[in-house]
C-alpha cells in the first residue's frame, strides 16, 4: 500500500472529521484521480515531437499516456480535425498516491525559486489545477536525453464539495501552498 494512502487513512481522515464535523468517515473528501496533460502544439509540424512528449509523460507517470487529438480544424494554428495535439494520463489508486508523494517531496522542491504553489487555483468544485513549466523537475527525466523543455498541467480531482474542504485535504497531505 502506498505511503500516502496509509497516511490518509490514519491521519488525514480523523483530522478532517474533527475540523469539519462529518458524521461519517465516508463524507470525508478524498483524492479521486490525478490527470497529467501535456499540450504539444509543435507536433503538427514534426511527428517525433509527439513521440518524445509521450515517452516523457510515460516516465513521469509510470503509465502509458493517451494521445489527444484536435476536435476541430483551426486554420490560424494550422491544425486539422483529428491531428494529434497533446497527450494525457489519468492516475488512480496506488499509482496516484505514489505520484503525489513524488510531486510533493521531490519534484516541487526542485523548482527554481520555489516559494509554494498558489492557493487560488481551485475551480469552485474542490478540484485543484497547477502547471509545471519544465518536465525536468521530475527525477525520472534525464536532462541529457530530452529534446525540448515542455510544461504540463496537473489536475487533482477530489470528492470535496467546496474549495475550502479541498484545500484542507491537500494541506494535510503537506501540499506546499504559499503563505
Curated annotation (Swiss-Prot):
**Which keywords appear in this protein's UniProt record, sorted alphabetically?**
Ribonucleoprotein, Ribosomal protein, RNA-binding, rRNA-binding, tRNA-binding
Write down the PROSITE patterns for this protein, in alphabetical order.
RIBOSOMAL_L5
Its GO biological process annotations read: translation
Enumerate the GO terms in the molecular function aspect: rRNA binding; structural constituent of ribosome; tRNA binding
Q: What does this protein do?
A: This is one of the proteins that bind and probably mediate the attachment of the 5S RNA into the large ribosomal subunit, where it forms part of the central protuberance. In the 70S ribosome it contacts protein S13 of the 30S subunit (bridge B1b), connecting the 2 subunits; this bridge is implicated in subunit movement. Contacts the P site tRNA; the 5S rRNA and some of its associated proteins might help stabilize positioning of ribosome-bound tRNAs.
A single GO CC term, please?
Answer: ribonucleoprotein complex
- Family, per entry: Belongs to the universal ribosomal protein uL5 family.
In the UniProt record, the gene name given for this protein reads rplE
Protein name, please?
Answer: Large ribosomal subunit protein uL5
| Assembly behavior | Part of the 50S ribosomal subunit; part of the 5S rRNA/L5/L18/L25 subcomplex. Contacts the 5S rRNA and the P site tRNA. Forms a bridge to the 30S subunit in the 70S ribosome.
Q: Name one Pfam family in it.
A: Ribosomal_L5
| Protein's organism | Neisseria gonorrhoeae (strain ATCC 700825 / FA 1090)
